[in-house]
Amino acid sequence: MGILEKVQPIEVMLPERYQTMSILEMEERVREIKEKMGALLFIPGHHYQKDEVVQFSDAAGDSLQLAQVAANNKEAKYIVFCGVHFMAETADMLTTDDQIVILPDMRAGCSMADMADIEQTERAWKELAKLFGDTMIPLTYVNSTAAIKAFCGRNGGATVTSSNAKQMVSWAFTQKERLVFLPDQHLGRNTAYDLGIPLEKMAVWNPHTDSLEYDGDIEEIQVILWKGHCSVHQNFTVKNIENVRKNHPDMNIIVHPECCYEVVAASDYAGSTKYIIDMIEAAPAGSKWAIGTEMNLVNRIIQQHPDKEIISLNPFMCPCLTMNRIDLPHLLWALENIERGEQINVIRVEKQVTEEAVLALNRMLERV
């Protein structure tokens, strides 16, 4: 079942009046509603959100940080999640039944999460079992649908974040001989390589051809990577790095591990969103940085650190387009509906899916 089938009710079109309101009018109304509702309303905002949204966030962070913060908030009745659908799903699964999770715009999806649907994954697992038998354990990046998390949960696997991927991959190899990593091949490849697994012992499962792509000996394969990627981080290239090295030879290059292996290998540093933020925060004044991650976050880091020279690794970088569907008009629309005693775009994950997905989430949370 897809995300849109799980949500009641669904409204896609923003009412016209929100498109004609001034920014100042909308900002004033959001403040009024936040003040009126107090602790009953909680607004988590992802690092990749626009400033117009982040300014109203009660907490900012990466996807799992925000879901955990939401889960720890027992006062809020309404959690208006300013992120994308898989994040809102995770928040719904980790919060109580009487808490209502709302996504301001149902079109705010994630192309990478959508690259692994449950039918493809079940089919792949059966085919891979013919090759490798009961020697595999699945791990999924938290940037995945609730259904994929549930698949991992019922098959003994777990979720991972970019911050704890090494720890979780290491754990996986204490459970089984082989790892199936969904849905981001780059995070899986970079993590496994950092742990000493050579590239020739990694294969890629292509869900479009239902085939395993590999160069080495099939018996030696330890990591099976799902053929998925982040559309934002895929756009950072080795050529970008070469240009920075040529034009700014004293500049540090730091990238997210969702970038491809070649880019990560050519960079000075690679790590999660939090790692990047903390690294720049701790860097001395006057230091120079080229950052390979989402544009809204890079621009915010630039604004927060005027004492440092910071640029985007790719000067023609675009923001995460689906994340950017959450904007001030949609946020206000969601809040005004709550104010009227109505809810739009409520995220509800089925009970069985929740139970199995929480197994995968808890296997991670109890180890990190």
Swiss-Prot record:
InterPro entries: NadA, NadA_sf, Quinolinate_synth_A_type3. GO terms for molecular function: 4 iron, 4 sulfur cluster binding; metal ion binding; quinolinate synthetase A activity. Pathway: Cofactor biosynthesis; NAD(+) biosynthesis; quinolinate from iminoaspartate: step 1/1. The lineage of its organism: Bacteria, Bacillati, Bacillota, Bacilli, Bacillales. Its EC number is 2.5.1.72. Its cofactor is [4Fe-4S] cluster. Belongs to the quinolinate synthase family. Type 3 subfamily. Keywords: 4Fe-4S, Cytoplasm, Iron, Iron-sulfur, Metal-binding, Pyridine nucleotide biosynthesis, Transferase. One of its GO terms (biological process) is 'de novo' NAD biosynthetic process from L-aspartate. It comes from Bacillus mycoides (strain KBAB4). It catalyses: iminosuccinate + dihydroxyacetone phosphate = quinolinate + phosphate + 2 H2O + H(+). Catalyzes the condensation of iminoaspartate with dihydroxyacetone phosphate to form quinolinate. Coiled coil: none annotated. [4Fe-4S] cluster binds at C110, C230, C320. This is Quinolinate synthase. Its main location: cytoplasm. One of its GO terms (cellular component) is cytosol. Pfam families: NadA (PF02445). Binds 1 [4Fe-4S] cluster per subunit. Iminosuccinate binds at H46, S63, Y141, V142, N143, S162, H256, P257, E258, T273.
